[in-house]
């Protein structure tokens, strides 16, 4: 499995946003300094200035209130219930849905055993600034606009993955970036010279759905394209079968 470095993680510390009270005070002081209106009767054009400024001030206050009231950073449609469960999940446990919204995801996120069919992502405990988080099969989670840790995607039948392809050829590199097949998510960035001997102009993304996962030890083969997971997903714990190499069968979607 070839993986692609993701975007660099954010710094561990970030500039804190102003509180709602500070936003109100700053906006009020700015308005008092810049906009003092004389007592004479204003022309029609000048009468429009005050409502416009009032509208802008209202929008600024709303943005400040939203920023201070929100406890989580919510890119890509993260829902609060899932994030709350993620941050309370023990090391080595799995969640039955991805952290982004999916049309095929369960409506209520739950912590499940990692060897169950419902397991989607696993808390491996990597800190967000660790080198292991620079892979596309991990998702960087943030809390209060600060980098927190990484969750590892698990390969599951029925989910779609983007692949780097060249016209008329099988997929060169299958990427970890699972999503529901009936939704559209932005394609991940392709690293420079990811596919040797291929110009960037000829590289394109295609979607492949996982149709079956077989054991390489049994001499299994796939009817369509395939990717070998060596080493396989690192899942350890009581009542979990020993690790074995996996052959992931994929088909164009």
Swiss-Prot record:
Origin superkingdom: Bacteria
Organism (species): Mycobacterium tuberculosis (strain ATCC 25618 / H37Rv)
Phylogenetic classification of the source organism: Bacteria, Bacillati, Actinomycetota, Actinomycetes, Mycobacteriales
A GO cellular component annotation in the UniProt record: plasma membrane
Name by which UniProt lists this protein: Uncharacterized protein Rv1424c
């Amino acid at each position: 499995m070839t993986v692609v470095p993701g975007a660099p993680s954010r710094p561990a510390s970030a500039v804190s946003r102003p509180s709602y009270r500070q936003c109100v005070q700053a906006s009020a002081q700015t308005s008092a300094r810049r906009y003092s209106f004389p007592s004479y009767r204003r022309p029609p054009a000048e009468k429009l200035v005050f409502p416009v400024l009032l509208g802008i001030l209202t929008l600024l206050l709303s943005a400040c209130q939203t920023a201070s009231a929100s406890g989580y950073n919510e890119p890509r449609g993260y829902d609060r219930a899932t994030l709350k469960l993620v941050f309370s999940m023990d090391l080595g446990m799995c969640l039955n849905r991805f952290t982004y919204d999916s049309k095929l995801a369960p409506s209520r996120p739950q912590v499940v055993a990692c060897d169950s069919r419902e397991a989607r992502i696993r808390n491996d405990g990597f800190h967000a600034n660790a080198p292991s988080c620079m892979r596309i099969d991990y998702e960087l989670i943030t809390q209060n606009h600060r980098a927190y840790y990484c969750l590892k995607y698990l390969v599951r039948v029925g989910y779609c993955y983007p692949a780097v392809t060249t016209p008329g050829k099988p997929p060169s590199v299958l990427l970890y970036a699972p999503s529901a097949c009936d939704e559209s998510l932005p394609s991940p960035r392709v690293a420079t010279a990811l596919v040797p001997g291929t110009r960037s102009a000829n590289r394109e993304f295609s979607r492949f759905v996982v149709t079956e996962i077989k054991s390489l030890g049994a001499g299994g083969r796939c009817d369509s394209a395939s990717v070998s997971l060596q080493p396989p997903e690192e899942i350890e714990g009581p009542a979990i079968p020993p690790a074995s190499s996996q052959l992931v069968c994929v088909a164009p979607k």
